[in-house]
């Protein structure tokens, strides 16, 4: 099925809860098994109850084979642009091209 000339993709939005760290990974694996195309992770580095989005995306990339990974939404003011670009490029290389950037100005800054 296509929409505006692009294939329609389906994704899941995972909460990176530090209380049960494996839960987000298990949900990502289940999503991949179910044929979901995209796994996104909340990026709230100031939230002590959450895992770091970039570390979690890297771990999920290592455990999955097909799903696209993205932060949802990566808050630009919270990281230096060069650090953010390098992290995204590193995950993209390590995952075989499965990292996509979703950037935002930030809602809580």
Where are these regions (language model features)?
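Short, basic, helix/turn surface patches
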Residues: 64-74, 98-100
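Active-site nucleophile and cofactor-binding loops and adjacent substrate-binding regions
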Residues: 48-49, 71-79
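Catalytic metal-binding/acid-base residues of hydrolase active sites
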Residues: 45, 74, 106-108
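Structural motif
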Residues: 41-42, 72, 102-104
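Flexible, glycine-rich active-site loops centered on histidine and acidic residues
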Residues: 4-21, 78-109
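N-terminal beta1-alpha1-beta2 module of alpha/beta enzyme domains
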Residues: 1-64, 68
């Amino acid at each position: 099925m296509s929409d505006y000339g692009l294939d329609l993709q389906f994704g899941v939005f995972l909460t990176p809860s530090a209380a049960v760290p494996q839960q987000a990974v298990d949900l990502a694996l289940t999503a991949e098994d179910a044929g979901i195309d995209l796994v996104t992770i909340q990026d709230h580095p100031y939230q002590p109850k959450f895992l770091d989005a970039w570390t979690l995306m890297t771990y999920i990339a290592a455990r999955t084979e097909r799903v696209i990974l993205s932060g949802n939404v990566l808050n630009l003011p919270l990281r230096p642009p060069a650090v953010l670009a390098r992290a995204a490029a590193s995950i993209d290389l390590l995952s075989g091209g499965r990292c996509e950037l979703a950037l935002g100005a930030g809602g809580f800054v």
